[in-house]
Amino acid sequence: MAKQTKKQQEVAKLDPEKLYTVDEAIAVLREHKAKFDETVEVAMNLGVDPRHADQMVRGMVSLPSGTGKTVKVAVFAKGDNAEKATAAGADKVGAEDLMEDMQNGNLDYDRVIATPDMMGVVGRLGKVLGPKGLMPNPKLGTVTPNVEQAVKDAKGGQVEFRVEKMGIIHSGIGKMSFKDEDLKANFKSFTDAIVKAKPSGAKGKYVKKVSLTSSMGPGLKIDLAEVEGA
């Protein structure tokens, strides 16, 4: 049996059933931080079955303190909209040329945005973008005439959330280098958005469990009293 590191031994001493406030959880994660700037992540177990359309939880939320990571954005637009997207900081802007580029496997993007008139072109990329969760969607604000704002939102800390098979939803909400108050503000914005996105088909208790963790740190259960409306 492999010998446990000192850090693993310290983590093993933590009570896995203890409920923490967000302040306490951040403090514990800082006590067990790694030598690199870890991502801080929140995970929520929801009382939904996403196999049913009326129990899907999906949307966008802007984190007030940003995510701490560089977001690569591609935009399908022409003319004036293309110029606005470029000025807003898009990493790649194009039309048919961008479609061909993506068909050739160049998909190193975190967000793909399109103007409505470009959906005829983007539609041909369904099999390429769909499996990666990158297909522009009007409900998520990624098909929009206002590409300038969409690019700024993507670059400025807007994250997409989508519930997974077992009713779990998770997202990075910042880095360990963030101040406590910035992590707390992002935690609140994210959990508020999930509570607000409660689907019509959800039955029984909606928010079952919330935990906070870091890239290499322990998973800490958060007291549901910390989540407004849970």
From Swiss-Prot:
GO terms for molecular function: rRNA binding; structural constituent of ribosome; tRNA binding. GO terms for biological process: regulation of translation; translation. InterPro entries: Ribosom_uL1_bac-type, Ribosomal_uL1, Ribosomal_uL1-like, Ribosomal_uL1/biogenesis, Ribosomal_uL1_3-a/b-sand, Ribosomal_uL1_CS. One of its GO terms (cellular component) is cytosolic large ribosomal subunit. CDD domains: Ribosomal_L1. Coiled coil: none annotated. It comes from the Bacteria. Keywords: Repressor, Ribonucleoprotein, Ribosomal protein, RNA-binding, rRNA-binding, Translation regulation, tRNA-binding. Part of the 50S ribosomal subunit. HAMAP family: Ribosomal_uL1_B. PANTHER family: 54S RIBOSOMAL PROTEIN L1, MITOCHONDRIAL, LARGE RIBOSOMAL SUBUNIT PROTEIN UL1M. Belongs to the universal ribosomal protein uL1 family. Binds directly to 23S rRNA. The L1 stalk is quite mobile in the ribosome, and is involved in E site tRNA release. Protein L1 is also a translational repressor protein, it controls the translation of the L11 operon by binding to its mRNA. This is Large ribosomal subunit protein uL1. It comes from Erythrobacter litoralis (strain HTCC2594).
